[in-house]
Amino acid sequence: MYLIFM
């Protein structure tokens, strides 16, 4: 779910 921060 780190893609949300990109």
Curated annotation (Swiss-Prot):
Source organism, top-level taxon: Bacteria
Disulphide linkage map: none
Keywords: Formylation, Leader peptide, Transcription, Transcription regulation
Protein induction: Induced by erythromycin.
Entry-annotated residues carrying N-formylmethionine: 1
Task of the protein: Leader peptide required for resistance to cladinose-containing macrolide antibiotics. In the presence of erythromycin (ERY) or azithromycin (AZI), binds antibiotic in the ribosomal polypeptide exit tunnel, inducing ribosomal stalling. The peptide inserts into a cavity in the tunnel, altering the positions of uracil-2584 and uracil-2485 of the 23S rRNA, which blocks recognition of the complex by release factors 1 and 2. The stalled ribosome inhibits formation of the downstream Rho-independent terminator, and thus promotes transcription of msrD.
Name used for this protein in its record: Leader peptide MsrDL
Taxonomic source organism: Streptococcus pneumoniae
